[in-house]
A protein has these predicted regions:
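N-proximal low-complexity "stem/linker" segments adjacent to membrane-targeting elements
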Residues: 1-50
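Catalytic-site signature of metal-activated, phosphate-bearing donor transferases
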Residues: 1-18, 104-122, 141-351
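Active-site-proximal specificity loops/subdomain of glycosyltransferases
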Residues: 10-28, 68-132
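A short acidic, amphipathic alpha-helical/loop segment
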Residues: 46-50, 72, 149-150
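Short, acidic, metal-binding catalytic loop of nucleotide-sugar glycosyltransferases
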Residues: 49-61, 65, 75-76
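Short beta-strand-to-loop acidic/aromatic patch adjacent to the donor-nucleotide binding site
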Residues: 130-143
């Protein structure tokens, strides 16, 4: 059993209990980033620097750390005092790498327990000052211009006419997106070149007009003697796939129907359990926004030396990955399962 939870069982954590009535508060137009931190000092400054200009506000909540993450957070808060707000989340959380006994224990806790990861996420959400929100992760470096462009769409107050062709092509794109298991050999070049220009225009206008939710993803990076490369694994073999966070990051408007609930999952490979968070959003339209960041997990200091040998021969140069003639050489099944997030990667500066 996790001793941290038992040891702090009788502590006064009333300040960390979350009343979901905060979801009904009217907020001014703007975009808030939510950054939750535990360790990760090596990436915090780079992450914040890449996203802060695009955001109206960055809420940083952090837990007890084993490195100097709190000091780095304070450094960045002082650098951007008009945008960054920092909160320390004191309760310990039981969520990752759980035994069956620990999982059974944590599932007995009430859904709003301060020791659940979902409550930690809701606590962070409760500190938001603006109407629109996006999750920010410490080990991600954002495509700053694209992020600002998306935030500007949510901040926009005017409407734009959606053309018949844009609407038609968007329906075709969504249909093809649902067919990737049926048509695994469908050419991504057609999808990217012919359809995606109209689809991207449609997405932008839908955000401006309807403030729909937008789902975004990232690109995993690795670094070796040849420079920056993209891994070609499948995660199950210990090597990252080319894509990161496929669909797990949303831009959304805070409402009574947007909050976090507990979510249980099991890692068969390691025989460990996880009691994480799941974003509840009722039934709302979600459009795909393509790539928005580089994911740096594979080059963490505590992983890099082991990964150098593991990743050897299982990467592709960033420039080659973006060349149309080489895209077809990427694992087709892996690629097609994620190709709906690929369409506008070439518009970002990945090299």
């Amino acid at each position: 059993m996790n001793s941290d939870i038992l040891y702090l069982e009788n502590a006064d954590y009333s300040d960390f209990l979350v009343d979901l009535s905060f979801l009904k508060i009217e907020r001014p137009v703007g975009v808030t980033g939510l950054l939750r931190v535990k360790n990760d000092a090596e990436f915090i400054e780079l992450c914040i620097s890449s996203c802060i200009d695009a955001l109206d506000e960055l809420i940083v909540t952090y837990q007890k750390s084993d490195d100097n993450a709190p000091e780095v957070i304070e450094k960045m808060r002082k650098k951007y005092p008009h945008k960054i707000k920092v909160y320390f989340y004191e309760p310990s959380i039981l969520s990752h790498n759980l035994s069956k006994e620990e999982l059974d224990f944590v599932k007995t806790m009430p859904e709003n327990s301060v020791h659940l990861l979902s409550n930690y996420y809701n606590y962070s959400l409760s500190k938001v000052s603006y109407k629109y929100v996006v999750k920010i992760d410490t080990d991600q470096v954002y495509f700053s211009e694209k992020l600002k462009g998306i935030c500007d769409l949510y901040r926009s107050s005017y409407t734009q006419k959606i053309t018949f062709k844009e609407r038609l092509v968007s329906n075709i794109a969504l249909y093809l997106d649902h067919c990737y298991n049926v048509l695994p050999l469908m050419g991504s070049l057609f999808f990217s070149n012919v359809i995606m220009g109209y689809y991207e225009s449609y997405i932008k206008k839908m955000i401006v007009n309807k403030k729909v939710m937008l789902s975004v993803s990232g690109v995993n990076l690795f670094f070796d003697k040849n420079g920056w490369e993209i891994p070609l694994g499948n995660n199950a073999n210990g090597i990252r796939s080319p894509f990161n966070g496929v669909g797990d990051t949303l831009f959304f408007e805070i409402s009574k129907d947007t909050y976090y609930t507990p979510w249980e999952c099991y890692d068969k490979r390691r025989n460990r359990y996880f009691y994480l968070e799941k974003f509840y959003k009722k039934e709302q339209t979600v459009l795909q926004g393509g790539f928005l960041w580089f994911h740096l997990d594979a080059i963490r200091k505590n992983k890099y030396l082991d990964n150098k040998s593991l990743y050897n021969g299982n990467t592709i140069k960033v420039a080659d990955f973006l060349k149309k003639k080489n895209i077809v050489n990427v694992n087709r099944i892996l690629f097609m399962k994620s190709f709906r997030f690929y369409y506008n990667v070439s518009s970002t500066n990945l090299e």
